[in-house]
């Protein structure tokens, strides 16, 4: 074999097959950019173990992480959205709904369940932000009212985890009506003397923040959650001024007295149970054993 044949044989040798990694095994933190093992991140409730950044969490997973295992019963799942107005922007509303339902496996942006929290009966609602930005339409409002009615029937407290861009524009006035509808329902909770706790997660904006999300007997926020009516960019363009750092974030709002406390997600379940037990004059719950990954200290010189 000549020298040129040896070179050609080496260049045409089939490379060894590399082990393929299934899609979705790894993910990257939105804040620090650290590559994270997906299963470990899920065990840590979507909180980055390196920088403690609270990533967005699916509504159904959130309810399962808070309520007692085996106690959950879904409410209002039979309610489904309809394109009554035959609305169309760049795409038909019914097509947007179909796409969102296919992508999320949910029928709308709010999931309601009743169950127990450390043995206490409770009704809980959580937004699915992946469903059209967690926007509030007729079904979201109807399910929220169903949650209130169930809490009244069971004489138990209610809590809601908000993650929404606001009212759903494709339902026009019908979506705006839900602001008054949900607020009126909560007035019945107040008359009965039953606690309603609102947990604001990233983001809670628009018509949701202007209605039931800020009407809690206790308004709790997750760290660095964006909370407000209009977004920072819209405000800057309107007032033509640069907004202060951290504007509309949880830490900014608690300084101004707009919310009551900031609670990290790994201890949220126990904090909610403790507060509700006190509000309902029940014995204090036993503290959960939290097995979260330790947050690595940040290098100040980095």
UniProtKB/Swiss-Prot annotation:
Zinc finger intervals, C4-type: 29-51
* EC number, UniProt record: 2.1.3.15
Instruction: Give the co-factor note.
Output: Binds 1 zinc ion per subunit.
- Localisation: Cytoplasm
Looking at the record, the residues that make up the CoA carboxyltransferase N-terminal domain are 25-294
Question: Matching Pfam families, A to Z?
Answer: Carboxyl_trans, Zn_ribbon_ACC
- GO CC field: acetate CoA-transferase complex
Q: Which residues form a coiled coil?
A: none
* Pathway(s): Lipid metabolism; malonyl-CoA biosynthesis; malonyl-CoA from acetyl-CoA: step 1/1
Reaction catalysed by this enzyme: N(6)-carboxybiotinyl-L-lysyl-[protein] + acetyl-CoA = N(6)-biotinyl-L-lysyl-[protein] + malonyl-CoA
Q: What is its main location?
A: cytoplasm
Q: InterPro entries under this entry? A: AcCoA_carboxyl_beta, Acetyl_CoA_COase_Trfase_b_su, ClpP/crotonase-like_dom_sf, COA_CT_N, Znf-ACC
**Per its UniProt entry, which superkingdom is the organism in?**
Bacteria
Which cofactors are reported in the record for this sequence? Answer: Zn(2+)
Q: Tell me the PROSITE patterns matching this sequence.
A: COA_CT_NTER
Question: Tell me, what is an example of a GO biological process annotation in this record?
Answer: fatty acid biosynthetic process
Keyword DNA damage annotated? no
Q: Give the UniProt keywords, A-Z.
A: ATP-binding, Cytoplasm, Fatty acid biosynthesis, Fatty acid metabolism, Lipid biosynthesis, Lipid metabolism, Metal-binding, Nucleotide-binding, Transferase, Zinc, Zinc-finger
Which positions does UniProt annotate for Zn(2+) binding?
A: 29, 32, 48, 51
NCBIfam families of this UniProt entry? accD
Question: What family does the database annotate?
Answer: Belongs to the AccD/PCCB family.
How is the subunit organization of this protein annotated in UniProt?
Acetyl-CoA carboxylase is a heterohexamer composed of biotin carboxyl carrier protein (AccB), biotin carboxylase (AccC) and two subunits each of ACCase subunit alpha (AccA) and ACCase subunit beta (AccD).
What functional role does this protein have?
A: Component of the acetyl coenzyme A carboxylase (ACC) complex. Biotin carboxylase (BC) catalyzes the carboxylation of biotin on its carrier protein (BCCP) and then the CO(2) group is transferred by the transcarboxylase to acetyl-CoA to form malonyl-CoA.
What is the recorded name of this protein?
Acetyl-coenzyme A carboxylase carboxyl transferase subunit beta
Q: Which organism is it from?
A: Erwinia tasmaniensis (strain DSM 17950 / CFBP 7177 / CIP 109463 / NCPPB 4357 / Et1/99)
